[in-house]
Amino acid sequence: TVFTKELCENNAKAEGVSNVRFAEGNAVRLPFADESFDAVTSNYVYHNISGRDKQKLLLETLRVLKKGGTFAIHDLMSKSRYGDMEAFVKKLKDMGCEDVRLIDTSNGLFMERKKAVWLDLGGSKLLVGRK
């Protein structure tokens, strides 16, 4: 599926949402100023973005988050894709982020275990916290 700006705008209109703006950009170099957003979220997207350094991608996402803003990034965070995420959580805390948690969702935290196994969600984790 190609998510055109028109498709996104039509979906927002159909849902009655008017306080959004759609922009095309590069996830590795987001076209937004530092601290532009109150919250950032992603659900199973980052593993599809090219580039080997997913932690760098996460830091770019946090760059555009306002101080005090909330983040929730859900993805297939296997060590081969993301590196040592426990060390990354510590790094975020050292940078001043609060309530940072890495929640294992590979066994169906948000769905029946049978469905999670069928979807092969090994390495699935939810990174949450506040900047």
Enumerate the predicted regions with their spans.
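A short SAM/SAH-binding and catalytic strip from SAM-dependent methyltransferases
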Residues: D38-R52
